[in-house]
């Protein structure tokens, strides 16, 4: 234990953790750049419905869910570095599929199919990337710093969303979807090169419980995470169309407001889950998320909507590390990658289910209704978290 403790405090370990987080930022631009553009591309350029928009966005997360188990086993048994680098390469392939969708002279259904293929590849890549980098980071700095590892990764992810959303809209409006796709293809390859020399961490040995027994240990924090995820899913999927329907500009900056507030909270308060425990931090965070989504639901102007998006980002920021601290406490070291992958899968399921369901709700009741649904989910998340951990 002493050796581990000393290792976790070395500057070299922290610098390696920074390199991993920066690579996550570069790779996750593959998600951030096209996120506000894909709904516009599917709805306006290909002429498909809101439900198809939801499918195009949400199907990525189903692919992530279905490959989380593989990603966890890969990280646990063969090394987290391999999982992370493999994920970066897959994310680059997703950009290649979108480039084909943009350049090939084919019909709208074929373009949509290529878009879906790219989203599926991206989902596979994301599961390898995030499971690998979380397990890699824990191996570098130790499980007592699990909140720090999750906070740094989260800052990278949502920093990429904050920067990527307006940049993606800018690239698309000036240079077209092909330029956007090419950019998303190159950035993960740069990340791969940047992380190539970061040292490996050894795979843990020991008896490995079954996946279902691991799920039995993590489902309570996972359920709270899933209910939190509805809020981000409705913003990521429908905020561009919501702004267009109201005649508002600055749609891309809603994700900047969300991501900026998210990152700021991680910088200022990312230490809280390690210090105070996950449950208290998660409950307060869900309250803030609820307030932000209610503002989006009722927003009379674009500026109020931006404030709502920022509040939602601030609320979502600490929930993953807060409840993730509880996951790390519950599982043995040799299945930590599997447990973190399974935990993140709850959020992926939430994202995947929310897209098409919210699309049907938006068609029936209008775009504001999806933000009300997100707020209700966050309130349910508060109740589930309080009741689950009180009984536990």
UniProtKB/Swiss-Prot annotation:
It is a multi-pass membrane protein. Its main location: membrane. SUPFAM superfamilies: MFS general substrate transporter. GO terms for molecular function: transmembrane transporter activity. Keywords: Cell inner membrane, Cell membrane, Membrane, Transmembrane, Transmembrane helix, Transport. The chain crosses the membrane at residues 22-42, 46-66, 97-117, 121-141, 151-171, 174-194, 224-244, 252-272, 276-298, 342-362, 369-389. Pfam families: MFS_1 (PF07690). GO terms for cellular component: plasma membrane. InterPro entries: MFS, MFS_dom, MFS_trans_sf, MFS_Transporters, MFS_YfcJ. It is found in: Cell inner membrane. CDD domains: MFS_YfcJ_like. PANTHER family: PTHR23517:SF1, RESISTANCE PROTEIN MDTM, PUTATIVE-RELATED-RELATED. HAMAP family: MFS_YfcJ. Belongs to the major facilitator superfamily. YfcJ family. This is Uncharacterized MFS-type transporter YfcJ.
